[in-house]
Regions:
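Short, solvent-exposed coil/turn linker segments
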Residues: 7, 21-22, 123
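Acidic/histidine-rich helix-loop elements
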Residues: 15-26, 55-60
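Extended interaction regions within the primary functional domain
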Residues: 3, 8-12, 25-29, 84, ...
């Protein structure tokens, strides 16, 4: 998968994510090396790896997860970059009426690495879980890829995806992130 680039007035954003990737596979596939080649002093790197790190086929144990996060951060900082960690939103399980933080042990590990390495973070796990519980299941179902047959041509049979978001869901998450970034005055680019 390619890197997606967005250019705004004085900012350029590159999205190096890839579906199904964990910290380990992000490193092993060379995606992290690609980021390191492009980093310049004072660049920000948002690390949001968590959802796939528990999967047995691509993931790793919590200790290994912390190792990769630490490795990534130290190498980014050596190049003059700044890391912002971001925990991931909850899953939307059909059999649950409320939302819970997904893989809390990995969330806690990420927050611990952020604290240990004095990095900023966005706790999207907590922020989105709280917001989703406030708004309720019916509303939140419209944000995830829970599509009826025929609703979209690409998914003629429908889809019941409890992890990924539709465009409206992505916009809600972007608003939650933007509000948190604006409230977090420790990040100089936002002052």
């Amino acid at each position: 998968e390619k890197v997606v680039r967005y250019d705004f007035h004085k900012y350029s954003i590159e999205n190096w994510s890839k579906g199904g990737i964990s910290c380990k596979t992000f490193y092993e596939t060379g995606r992290f090396a690609g980021i390191l080649k492009r980093i310049r002093k004072n660049d920000y790197v948002i690390i949001a790896l968590q959802h796939n790190d528990k999967k047995p086929d691509v993931g790793e144990k919590v200790a290994d997860y912390k190792h990769y996060l630490t490795y990534f951060t130290q190498h980014i900082q050596r190049k003059g970059g700044k890391v912002i960690f971001m925990t991931t939103p909850p899953k939307n399980y059909a059999d649950r009426k409320t939302f819970k933080i997904y893989v809390p042990e990995y969330r806690n590990a990420m927050l611990q690495v952020a604290k240990d390495l004095k990095c900023n973070y966005i706790d999207l796990s907590k922020l989105s879980t709280d917001y989703f519980n406030f708004r309720g299941k019916n509303y939140v179902n419209t944000l995830y890829m829970k599509l009826n047959p025929g609703q979209y041509p690409a998914w003629e049979q429908g889809i019941n995806d409890d992890t990924h978001f539709q465009r409206d869901g992505a916009k809600v998450l972007a608003r939650i992130i933007a509000v948190d970034l604006q409230a977090n005055r420790q990040i100089p680019m936002l002052n």
